[in-house]
């Protein structure tokens, strides 16, 4: 028997807390499952959202475990498991939106890799410590999967002649999207929006072709983009607008900057029309009415939809490959010990994080 500690909650009225139980590592898994000893787990806004929307009347009384992104070591493997063995270094995104009886901010994570497809093997980079490897690889599954899905889910076959606009170039998703777009899909033009102070970094270090500020008091970001399409792209519109931060200011100009339905243009959002205030989340406010109208309005002449990350192995394998090649480096904002989980949550709620917030579980 071993101690198994997790950061858990019951519903939105109960605070996060560390709960402990004992599990028998020889009996706690099925033939189709593996047991991962978690070394690091990363927090994502969806973790806070799920806690905040766990209303007592619908979420039940069972404890729910915080977290999705993880990295660790396989310590047990069922006899029917294929592709994973004891000692493997693995990372992934654990998906259980409904019950959340298992999560990544815990000592052990039991999963069926034939169902939980967002899992991959990883290798330490040359000169990298064990801790650094676990921290880095806990920090990218969800955001990299989101970026990959934005670029591929509509099967636009984006390439050298394509043009992509990223709203939120400084976000972790925006960074990953740029790296996939340039290094794997070889997309010709990737433009982003960010603060004036981040333009130089996002262009010279990250690699965006052009950036416009969202905090220019003389002209909105949407007006900047409209002028850029007209003057620099000579009227050639974007194939894809990927909203990684929550914005609605581009819709008045949408027909001037993005290709229409008939030309397979797509506006994809992972947030909705506005940036969430994760300290004050209510169910009705979380439902994006304007977004629903845009999505289901039969009279609009552009494609608009929300993007959700599927459980899939392709983006996990791609992310691991790009890290090994040096074409993608996950951004890590800060690292906290397991007992400092509340400080990690506060950092996420601050909206000031520049990269992933990681909790060291071991």
Swiss-Prot record:
Its Gene Ontology cellular component terms are: lipid droplet; mitochondrion
SUPFAM superfamilies referenced in this protein's UniProt entry, alphabetically: GroES-like, NAD(P)-binding Rossmann-fold domains
InterPro entries per UniProt: ADH-like_N, GroES-like_sf, NAD(P)-bd_dom_sf, PKS_ER, YIM1/Zinc_Alcohol_DH_Fams
Any one Gene Ontology BP term: DNA damage response
Q: Name one GO molecular function term.
A: alcohol dehydrogenase [NAD(P)+] activity
Q: Which UniProt keywords apply?
A: Lipid droplet, Mitochondrion
The record's Pfam families line, in alphabetical order, gives: ADH_N (PF08240), ADH_zinc_N_2 (PF13602)
The record's section on CDD domains has: AST1_like (cd08247)
Subcellular compartments = Lipid droplet; Mitochondrion
What family does this belong to?
A: Belongs to the YIM1 family.
Would you tell me the protein name for this molecule?
A: Protein YIM1
- The organism is Vanderwaltozyma polyspora (strain ATCC 22028 / DSM 70294 / BCRC 21397 / CBS 2163 / NBRC 10782 / NRRL Y-8283 / UCD 57-17)
